[in-house]
Amino acid sequence: MADRLTQLQTCVDQMLTQYFSALTHINTNHGFKSLAGEELVKDDTVPVVTDEERERTLEELAKDLVVKSQQIDYLIDSLPGIGSSEEHQMQQIEKLQKELEHYDQVTEDVIKEKDELLEHCDELILKLAQRKAHIDVESM
């Protein structure tokens, strides 16, 4: 799962796409009106859409934009640090830094212990090999 900032950026990108799609739809599916005293101009490349259908589509596009806005608001509200002071955030960072240093030390200690155990295993294997070689020499 993506982090909140990535989700927020994705939602903003999606909302911009929705805005563009809505504007494109409005631009291509608008109704023609005649100006005072002039005859109605028509464009054969523009599909004929009833007023009812146009309104229903515009309402659906508007609802989609509202839902996306709510998602963005939710993500913004869920960002860490919202509602806490800068001092509190700095204290939290210091606490996490100390925790990280502690776990770095634990990791370092475990690696050191692993190296010591490997060295001990090497010594034991070497002793066993020497004893086996000594036994093989005596049995000849």
Curated annotation (Swiss-Prot):
Residues 52-130 form a coiled coil. Gene3D superfamilies: Mediator complex, subunit Med21 (6.10.280.10). It comes from the Eukaryota. One of its GO terms (molecular function) is transcription coactivator activity. Its main location: nucleus. GO terms for cellular component: core mediator complex; mediator complex. GO terms for biological process: negative regulation of transcription by RNA polymerase II; positive regulation of transcription elongation by RNA polymerase II; positive regulation of transcription initiation by RNA polymerase II; regulation of transcription by RNA polymerase II; RNA polymerase II preinitiation complex assembly. Pfam families: Med21. The keyword Hydrolase does not apply. Keywords: Activator, Coiled coil, Nucleus, Transcription, Transcription regulation. It is found in: Nucleus. Component of the Mediator complex, a coactivator involved in the regulated transcription of nearly all RNA polymerase II-dependent genes. Mediator functions as a bridge to convey information from gene-specific regulatory proteins to the basal RNA polymerase II transcription machinery. Mediator is recruited to promoters by direct interactions with regulatory proteins and serves as a scaffold for the assembly of a functional preinitiation complex with RNA polymerase II and the general transcription factors. Belongs to the Mediator complex subunit 21 family. Component of the Mediator complex. This is Mediator of RNA polymerase II transcription subunit 21. It comes from Yarrowia lipolytica (strain CLIB 122 / E 150) (Yeast).
